[in-house]
Amino acid sequence: MRSGVIAQKIGMTRVYNETGEHIPVTVLRMENCQVVAQRTEEKNGYTAVQLGVGLAKVKNTSKALRGHFAAASVEPKAKVAEFRVSPENLLDVGAEITADHFVPGQKVDVTGTSIGKGFQGVMKRHNFGGGRATHGNSVSHRTHGSTGQRQDPGKVFKGKKMAGHMGDRRVTTQNLEVVSTDTERGLILVRGAVPGSKGSWIMVRDAVKAPLPKEAPLPAAIRASNNNAEKAAATAAGEGAE
């Protein structure tokens, strides 16, 4: 089981495939998605990684969180979340996950907070048909009608669909297709709609109901540090000289 990522919802647009068909996509952006802490079986009783994304002002970060980020040698993060992983896919603290963590064609599950709609009636909230428009109906055109039966059972059952607060809930949409990724800009293009408003934080994970593609990097797609890049460049230069 691999780690997921935290991304920010930018909005929706459309792209075209090789045959000229347009595909509606949601654009998600990863901004400095780094491992902030580890959770191990020996110390915590489970295995997970804590990721942080975005940048937060130091003055708006609590003293406890400043110490937490300093221990990981990362800048203060705007959003922090944990992802359960298998022991072999545990990531080092400070590692940065890139957008090519997911591959085109892969299925993912996305989790976000749906847009709040406030108090709504049953026609909008539950897609009820409403009452009659004429023939004796007055002031009851959009009501839900009866909510119970008679003296027995003499109550309204729990879960009855009625008017109430709509939206602003944690929603997970499963099996969305990754259309493409842009590592340089940290973009993930996902087919279809993603719950949440523009600017909201979205958790993106490997789909639990679809197999992981063989091309998916394990344990994750990690951005090479400057030191590693310099070593790789020096090695390549040495091989070229030989």
From Swiss-Prot:
GO terms for biological process: translation. Methylated by PrmB. The keyword rRNA-binding applies. The modification N5-methylglutamine is found at Q151. Residues 131-165 are annotated as: Disordered. Residues 135-150 have a biased composition (Polar residues). Keywords: Methylation, Ribonucleoprotein, Ribosomal protein, RNA-binding, rRNA-binding. One of its GO terms (cellular component) is cytosolic large ribosomal subunit. The keyword Nucleotidyltransferase does not apply. GO terms for molecular function: rRNA binding; structural constituent of ribosome. Belongs to the universal ribosomal protein uL3 family. PANTHER family: 50S RIBOSOMAL PROTEIN L3, LARGE RIBOSOMAL SUBUNIT PROTEIN UL3C. NCBIfam families: L3_bact. One of the primary rRNA binding proteins, it binds directly near the 3'-end of the 23S rRNA, where it nucleates assembly of the 50S subunit. Part of the 50S ribosomal subunit. Forms a cluster with proteins L14 and L19. HAMAP family: Ribosomal_uL3_B. This is Large ribosomal subunit protein uL3.
